[in-house]
């Protein structure tokens, strides 16, 4: 990734995470207000009733940055899809420890 501004962001969220709706409800509008194009995977789009969604691999190919809200399993699933495209991942732990 170069020093250019991040403009395309993929967002993935753990399904059924209790805090997901609140976090996504604040994060997605904020990113859009910053003039970022936000890509949501199908599960994440369903959580907040968005109609537009993409496959993990498609998001990984197009995004400048991936944001993952969830636990280890969610992060590992996204990392597997993103690995061939060398896209940075910002992980936010919503899982439990242990």
Where are these regions (language model features)?
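N-terminal donor/sugar-recognition subdomains of glycan-related enzymes
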Residues: 1-2, 27
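Catalytic, metal-anchored helix/loop core of enzyme active sites in primary metabolism
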Residues: 18-19, 30-36
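Short internal beta-strands
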Residues: 36-43
């Amino acid at each position: 990734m170069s020093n250019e501004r991040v403009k395309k962001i993929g967002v993935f969220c753990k399904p059924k995470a209790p805090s997901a709706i609140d976090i996504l409800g604040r994060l997605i509008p904020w990113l859009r207000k910053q003039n970022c194009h936000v890509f949501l995977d199908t599960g994440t789009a369903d959580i907040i009733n968005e109609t537009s969604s993409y496959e993990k691999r498609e998001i990984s190919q197009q995004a400048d940055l991936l944001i993952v809200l969830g636990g280890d399993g969610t992060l590992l699933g996204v990392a597997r899809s993103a690995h061939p495209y060398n896209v940075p991942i910002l992980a936010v732990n919503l899982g439990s420890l242990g």
